[in-house]
Amino acid sequence: MTDPDSYRSSITSRPSFNRTVTSSSQNYGAPGSGNRVLKIVTETHSSSVSSGLSPYGQNAASTIRDNREREKKEIMELNDRLASYIEKVRFLDAQNRKLDADLKMLQGRFGKSTGSVKVMYEMEITTATNVVKQTGKDHGETEKEIRKLQDQLDELRKKFEEAQRGRAEDRLKIDDLLVTLSNLEAEINLLKRRIALLEEEVARLKKENFRLTSELQRVRIELDQETLLRIDNQNKVKTILEEIDFMKRGFETELKELQAQAARDTTSENREYFKNELANAMRDIRAEYDQIMNGNRNDMESWYQLRVQEINTQSNRQNAENNYQKEEVKRLRNQTSELRQKLSDLESRNLLLEKQIEDLNYQLEDDQRSYEAALNDKDAQIRKLREECQALMVELQMLLDTKQTLDGELKVYRQMLEGNSEGNGLRQLVEKVVRTSAINEEADTETMRVVKGEHSSRTSYQRSAKGNVAIKETSPEGKFVILENTHRAKEEPLGDWKLKRKIDGKREIVFTFPSDYILHPFQSVKIFARGQGIANPPEVLIFEGDETFGVGANVQTILYNNKGEERATHIQRQSQQTTSS
């Protein structure tokens, strides 16, 4: 029998625990026998998600996400209830075995130290009462903390709703700015098109001006040639006139000689004949000469007048066209300058609007991330407190049930110790000492055999990420590792990133991504060890360095970027435990 002075109660409140069971593979053994494997997954993930989908895509994504969250919560509640039932059954089973052993011990040794049994159970009742009071006090503090956190959550929800309204207003403002930007871009394109047309017109006019200038130059060259030809002809006329004068003088000299000869001729008939012939010849020569001179003079005058008239007409037309082209070029230059000035103003305004839109988008994303992070933290705290409160309530109910059971058993023990009205209770128990001792030994042996057959294996996972890339899953057998990009619209370049896997703090396996590898939004990549899968880039890669990523009781998988910074972690811990009462 245990000494009452050294006896310590075994009734204590169960340690608080955070139940975040999200694994879909759980194996619960039957109460009191077999192996029990409980897989606990704790995920910590922080990432920035920007809204890059259309409203219909966002509604569909939010609906799917809500359904998944609701299903996960239902699974978590069912897992909690199942674990609670199993733990309650095991606890009651162990409690029954302990009480049965105590009862048999008391029955076997009754009459030797009955007073110590009473002291032991009074200590048990006192300890259970203190535990109930302490549990009630913890329950009240937890309720106060929950109400306080509920107020903070309401305040944060109000702020979040205000942020949502501000976000909607910013969206409307952004839409208006986008409409304005589109109009400005359309106007800019129209002005650019007009400028291009005007530049084409200016080029055409320049070509026409060059053609007319070339034509004018050609006409001037022809005029110079005609002028030179006229001067040449005038010189020829002068030369011919001089020749005519010379011939006239020669003819006159010859005529005088003939007259002198005729004068020397004494015959009057001969003199008259020669005189008439000479007069006729001179008249014919003079008439022919005058006719030739008049014809040449008329031809030259008509030709020169025609050429001068043509040159004057072309010169006047060319001057008029040049003046019109100069005016048109001046007008086009002024219009081009005005359009370029307006285009510069519109481009400046466009840059300002784009800068404002970019600033508003950054501010909106920062506000959304901060509010979502705050709400997630508060929701996690409230969920944790509720789980603790629920566990305390279950524990309190179990303690109350235990107290009631102990009260009933104490009442029975008192009746057994005090005996009935005939006073034969103690005597009957003393007579059964030898027989109950044998039964007690047999029961203890069987109980130890059952307890030694119970083993529990506990595997826990913990994930964290500092960005959009997270370690989604690792194979417990070391066959593969899966990474995912949680962002909706942003690509993540993973070139030269390293995936390190540490096995029990001893072995280290390193996989390096290709230098040009990019992980697309909402996509995942599965990395197989050598011989464990078939390569299908970019969705499936093969690690040629080893046939396995390694297995162990403590496995750490860490993702580093090309600068050596830690971006994501995945920790797997496995422990096996043998329990006995």
Curated annotation (Swiss-Prot):
Mainly expressed in regions of the hypodermis adjacent to muscle. Expressed in longitudinal stripes where the mechanosensory neurons interface with the hypodermis. Also expressed to the uterine seam and within the uterine-vulval cells. SUPFAM superfamilies: Intermediate filament protein, coiled coil region, Lamin A/C globular tail domain. One of its GO terms (biological process) is protein localization to nuclear envelope. Residues 107-120 are annotated as: Linker 1. Keywords: Cell junction, Coiled coil, Intermediate filament. Residues 75-106 are annotated as: Coil 1A. It comes from the Eukaryota. Residues 425-578 are annotated as: Tail. Residues 277-424 are annotated as: Coil 2. GO terms for molecular function: structural constituent of cytoskeleton. The keyword Phosphoprotein does not apply. InterPro entries: IF_rod_dom, Intermed_filament_ifa/ifb, Lamin_tail_dom, Lamin_tail_dom_sf. Residues 71-424 form the IF rod domain. Residues 259-276 are annotated as: Linker 12. It is found in: Cell junction, Hemidesmosome. Residues 457-574 form the LTD domain. Cytoplasmic intermediate filaments provide mechanical strength to cells. Essential protein, involved in attachment structures in epidermal cells that connect muscles to the external cuticle. Probably acts by forming hypodermal hemidesmosome complexes that help mediate muscle-cuticle force transduction. Although expressed during embryogenesis, it is not required for embryonic development of muscle-cuticle linkages nor for the localization of other proteins to the hemidesmosomes in embryos. Forms some heteromeric filaments with ifb-1. This is Intermediate filament protein ifa-2. It comes from Caenorhabditis elegans. The gene is mua-6.
